[in-house]
From Swiss-Prot:
This is Probable cell division protein WhiA. One of its GO terms (biological process) is cell division. Belongs to the WhiA family. Involved in cell division and chromosome segregation. One of its GO terms (molecular function) is DNA binding. Residues 280-313 bind DNA. HAMAP family: HTH_type_WhiA. Keywords: Cell cycle, Cell division, DNA-binding. It comes from Lachnoclostridium phytofermentans (strain ATCC 700394 / DSM 18823 / ISDg).
Amino acid sequence: MSFSKEVKEEITKQMNNARHCRLAEIAALLSACGHVIQKDGEIKSIVLQTENILVARKYFTLLKKTFNINTEILIRKNKAGKNSLLFLLVVKLPKQVSLLYQATKLSLHHELGDKALVVDPIVVQNTCCKRAFVRGLFLAAGSMSDPEKTYHYEIVFPDLERASQLQEIINSFLIDAKIVLRKKYYVVYVKEGSQIVDLLNIMEAHTSLMDFENVRILKEMRNSINRQVNCEAANINKTVTAAAKQIDDILFIRDTIGFDNLTEGLEEIAELRISYPESSLKELGAMLNPPIGKSGVNHRLKKLCSIADGLRQ
């Protein structure tokens, strides 16, 4: 099962006690995958159409708990995809249609198409209702990448108006949601790991949140270890390169003027550097009598390099 589906499985089980929050979630589901059927300018039925059984199940339960409506469910083969089904939940009794339409404050936006249902901002004025609204939209039209691979949360809309409404709601939680046009759809997305954690908390997907956080912590630990290893490898390469040049300079001095022309301190460190090419400056300093520190060894080796450079000119 994908991580996105796990999140949806979890939020399907979330059911608000407050009626106004349930209305916000119903409005979100209908805005994402609902439409109305009209005749002579009058709304005859409200239909939710989805390929996702989780959406159908949640909508059915919300209608039952909120309005005591037992929705008619139609199951059809999906012509757009092989071996998949379409679930159609239809409310068509006049009183129920009127009650549902008015309670959810939905409205038809003819500029977006005769069937486009837009949610009135009054439905999501409370913070708790905003949470329910985001949860409903993610369930109906959202997806989330596996955190093992990448961090990405998105909800897809056919028009900018509904995308902008969600962006504004998510941003009210201090989360930086952005909108991108992908083909003919508007995608509201979040890519920062800690902000996706916040979104999971907003949707009350607490188990998924812990799973996401565990993966994120492990990834950060691995990245930290990799950076440390890379840094150490770079330091080793730097040390090896420096040691190779030091040895090359020392051998040039030996073959040109000999060590007898060096001071006692320089001769000692020159002999040690040749004898122990893999030793660190600290280790070389400890071999001297009396021992000297890393900076003292470095000073002598630089002096030898300077002598070699002078001889080459």
